[in-house]
A protein has these predicted regions:
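Membrane-interface segments at or immediately adjacent to transmembrane helices
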Residues: 96-177, 183
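OB-fold and OB-like beta-barrel modules that bind single-stranded nucleic acids
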Residues: 181-187, 230-239
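Beta-strand/loop nucleic-acid-binding surfaces
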Residues: 212-226
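Membrane-embedded alpha-helical segments of integral membrane proteins
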Residues: 11-69, 75-76
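OB-fold/S1-family single-stranded nucleic acid-binding modules
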Residues: 244-268
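Short aromatic-glycine-enriched beta-strand elements
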Residues: 194-205, 248-251
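Short nucleic-acid-contacting surface segments enriched for D/E, G, S/T with interspersed K/R
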Residues: 49, 222-235
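Internal/C-terminal transmembrane anchor helices
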Residues: 73-100, 112-113
Length: 270
């Protein structure tokens, strides 16, 4: 082995990788684009990770310039660098786009019942969503049932109460039959839909986009063919009960539809 005072290029390369990942995380957090990848409640963890990576870069870079380097004439395996370079290259080369109808079609969707979360009612994510929905109803001067759905007037499905309201209606559609509902979502279809039917959904993010699941309702409209998959629309309609795939499900009979812009944050969270 040969030992001499020199710049350790291997450590410099590693330190630059750490710097790039740190800059990437800082950029995503500052620009708000981090919400395209993870649940906002985990943003603080991304901030801490960016700071940690920046600190690791400083230590690694300092050590590369101020230490003896031992040469054993064995170059580091290039695959190690490829593993780090690929994510950076993908971020730079691929468009930063939200999950769309094609992803929803590939992942599939079960319209049969309220199935948006795996947590039992009254616990975990559903408990937080229920409390939030109830607070929203009370602040608006509306009485709500134990699911947070308003007892009178149109049911307004918002980004804040989406999971709880859609779950509640999906689990007990008969209880909400005849109620008017207003909702924003995007269009999706599958091979089982009739020409006048489509799904109106949004992606639900629990932790990150890897676990994203589409949730929403079947909607009926004589103008259904006018709206292509992926089109964002605002709708107003009446909840009906129908059979789908041998199960009772809520179906919205649309009375009003208008095209809408995709929200700045297209996802909803439990």
């Amino acid at each position: 082995l040969q030992q001499q005072m020199a710049i350790d290029w291997e450590k410099i390369i590693k330190s630059l990788m750490l710097l790039c990942f740190s800059i990437l995380l800082f950029y995503l957090v500052i620009s708000g684009q981090i919400q395209m990848y993870i649940n906002p409640r985990f943003t603080v963890l991304s901030e801490l990770a960016a700071v940690a990576l920046l600190s690791m870069f400083a230590v690694q870079f300092f050590n590369s310039r101020n230490s003896f380097h031992v040469y054993d004439h064995h170059a580091p395996h290039k695959l190690v660098y490829v593993i780090f370079i690929i994510p950076l290259a993908l971020f730079l080369l691929l468009p930063n786009a939200a999950l769309d109808a094609s992803v929803a079609s590939n992942r599939g969707f079960n319209f049969n019942s309220g199935n948006l979360t795996s947590a039992p009612p009254g616990s975990g994510a559903l408990a937080r969503a229920s409390a939030k929905s109830a607070d929203l109803g009370e602040s608006a001067g509306q009485q709500t049932d134990n699911t947070g759905v308003s007892k009178s007037g149109p049911i307004q499905v918002t980004a804040d109460n989406f999971v709880r309201v859609v779950d509640a209606i999906g689990q007990s559609p008969e209880d909400y039959a005849g109620r008017e509902i207003e909702m924003l979502g995007f269009v999706i279809r599958n091979k089982d839909f009739a020409p006048q039917e489509f799904g109106l959904i949004r992606f639900i993010i629990t932790c990150c986009t890897a676990d994203a699941s589409p949730g929403g309702f079947i909607l009926k409209s004589k103008d259904a063919v006018d709206y292509k998959d992926g089109t964002w629309i605002n709708i107003r309609g009446v909840i009906e009960v129908d059979d789908y795939d041998q199960q009772v499900v809520p179906v919205i009979e649309a009375t009003f539809i208008e095209r809408a812009a995709q929200p700045s944050d297209p996802y909803v969270y439990p």
